[in-house]
Amino acid sequence: MRTRNILLASLLIALCGCQPEMPKKYASKAAEWQLASNTGCFMCHTTGKNLMGPAWESVADRYRNNPDAEAHLTNIIINGGSGAWISRDMPGYPEKLLSVENRKILVKFILSLE
């Protein structure tokens, strides 16, 4: 576990500042895009293709009509998740890393993508 955390921290440092170009169709969501960038989401996720994690449009498609989607995705962001998409685990982002309000913004942003 310690080795994994060290590797994750090293990756975060190495990729600091990496941000994919925002697709023009999401221009109205620039603030949410920037929040995702500042939070480090783009190290594993992006739009239009899978990276280490699933493309966000795929997440939106899977959960869009699920009445529990916001709660489910919020729980994954807080506690992390594994096995739902690919073989890699997603680390959790507790409140000390990502505020309740910012988690809500990110979940709504992800679910709004088409």
PLM segments and residue spans:
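Bacterial N-terminal signal peptides that target proteins for export
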Residues: M1-L7
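C-terminal motif of bacterial Sec signal peptides marking the signal peptidase cleavage site
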Residues: A14-G17
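Gly/Gly-Pro-rich "capping" loops immediately C-terminal to redox-active cysteine motifs
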Residues: W33, T46-N79
